[in-house]
Design a protein with these regions (language model features):
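Conserved GNAT acetyl-CoA-binding A-motif
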Residues: 76-86, 241-254
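Short amphipathic alpha-helix that is part of the acyltransferase structural core
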Residues: 1-14, 49, 60, 120-176, ...
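Conserved beta-hairpin
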Residues: 25-31, 94-102, 125, 181, ...
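Conserved active-site alpha-helix within GNAT-family acetyltransferase domains
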Residues: 89-103, 231, 255-272, 279
Length: 283
């Protein structure tokens, strides 16, 4: 694992500690902190009910602390999720794995503060737009990741039909209504690449806190892939964050092919986050 510089480590650790509090309450279990949604169905950063070591408590985490957090997660009916910077709590992985949970690595990449972002071409007629709470494209943009990250996504014309179905789903299940206040409050920035008819082809988001942010949720409609849309959305999100006084912009990746895209935008390897296999993605 690549170790990041101490100042960068501190910025990212501070961010990870602060941003969930925009969406959740904190419950402390000794050196571990569990984030709990204050309202069912509310937007959440880190998945519903994830835990992380506190900055001061990281060296003191023990098996009993982990067991107490897991018991509370079961009581809440949420996944037994943990996420932390690897070098912030070096002994925690072994303890988590000894408790029977599978740990995954997610390498981080950071955009150097003064690194210019490249100008990326877009396909004819495609535009980039930051979506407001009342944007007519919002429901479809929130539905798109469910298709983009599906195990067996559709392709071709079937994409549009499935996106329409999922748009009705996220509207009906309260997702759209729950996200709107978050957008209005400035706790989330959602950006989409839109086809000429207004249908989102790719989306991504970031949540700002403490002068830092992590770009995530970058996904492309399967039939619109291989046109550079994910890179364009990522670059536009990074530029937007910088324009709004965010000076630490980073992201995580799971596949080397994705890391190569980020590297072409100027992102450079940093540290590593650890999380539990199968835990919910950030939203």
């Amino acid at each position: 694992m690549r170790r990041m510089s101490d100042p960068l480590h501190d910025r990212i650790q501070e961010y990870y500690a602060a941003v969930p509090l925009l969406f959740a309450a904190a419950e402390d279990f000794g050196p571990l902190r569990l984030f709990v949604r204050e309202e069912p169905g509310a937007p959440y950063y880190g998945g519903p009910g994830h835990a992380q070591p506190t900055r001061r408590g990281a060296p003191r985490v023990g098996a009993d602390d982990i067991a107490r957090v897991r018991a509370r997660q079961r009581e809440l009916g949420v996944p037994e999720a943990f996420e932390w910077l690897a070098d912030a709590a070096p002994a925690l992985r072994a303890l988590i794995e000894a408790a029977g949970l599978t740990v995954l690595e997610r390498p981080l990449m950071v955009l150097p503060a003064h690194r210019p972002l490249p100008a990326l071409p877009l396909p004819d007629g495609v535009t980039l737009r930051v979506l407001t709470a009342d944007d007519p494209a919002l429901p479809a943009a929130l539905a798109l990741p469910r298709l983009a990250f599906a195990q067996q996504p559709g392709t071709g014309p079937a994409d549009r039909a499935e996106l329409s179905r999922l748009t009705r789903e996220v509207t009906g299940d309260g997702t759209v209504a729950a996200v709107r206040p978050t957008l209005r409050a400035g706790h989330k920035t959602l950006l989409a690449a839109l086809a000429p008819d207004g249908v989102p082809l790719a989306v991504g988001h970031y949540h700002p806190a403490t002068g830092a942010t992590e770009i995530g949720g970058v996904g492309t409609l399967p039939s619109a892939r291989r046109q550079g849309l994910a890179a364009a959305v990522t670059a536009a999100l990074a530029a937007h964050a910088r324009e709004h006084d965010i000076d630490t912009v980073f992201l995580a990746y799971a596949q080397e092919s994705v890391a190569r895209i980020y590297a072409r935008l100027g992102f450079r390897p940093a540290g590593t986050t650890l999380l539990i296999a199968g835990q919910p993605a950030r939203s």
